[in-house]
A protein has these predicted regions:
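Conserved catalytic or regulatory cores that recognize and/or transform ribose-phosphate-containing ligands
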Residues: 1-167
Length: 167
């Protein structure tokens, strides 16, 4: 009987922009899959069938009410995926880490999940010289043995190391 592959939850703001989605689906997701992990992708956990009715509504109270219901579903789906993953890979780019990504890092860390931070952004983002990103975000990344890396080759090697733990 074949064992299910270990799961990585991919926390990132990359789904919000076309260029982000291109990197996410052309580089990052394939890299994780190549190592052997199953990807839990928050950008596809909530289906278009749920999203499209809200998108189609004209601006106003009905649209706002619909989105509030959908937002709860999205949050629940993502929380469930974080609970069910073995590892979190969090993209921590930007002048400040995306608030949703930071929340997913903290939630996963509280559940005892290891978190790998990936930062391809060369801009400074830390609170002081002792951290790479916000000190609290970095604390939660490192809490359960995680690390922040800044290049894809190193990320691949880190993922391989973690894969051995879970297979």
């Amino acid at each position: 009987m074949k064992k299910n592959p270990p799961k990585v939850y991919l926390a990132s703001p990359f789904g919000f922009s076309e260029s982000g989605r291109l990197f996410y689906y052309e580089k990052l997701v394939p890299l994780v899959v190549e190592v052997g992990f199953e990807v839990l992708d928050p950008w596809v956990l909530t289906t278009d069938k749920i999203l499209k009715p809200a998108i189609a509504l004209p601006y106003g109270q009905k649209k706002k009410d619909k989105w509030q219901k959908i937002n709860k579903i999205i949050g629940q789906n993502n929380a469930k995926a974080i609970k069910n993953c073995n590892l979190i890979l969090a993209v921590v780019d930007g002048t400040d880490v995306d608030s949703g990504t930071a929340s997913e890092i903290g939630y996963g860390a509280a559940l005892g999940k290891a978190v790998i931070g990936y930062r391809s952004d060369f801009r400074l983002s830390s609170d002081n010289e002792g951290s790479t990103v916000n000190l609290q975000v970095e604390y939660f990344i490192k809490l359960n043995g995680g690390i922040i890396t800044t290049n894809l080759n190193e990320l691949k090697n880190i993922l391989k190391h973690h894969f051995k733990k879970y297979k």
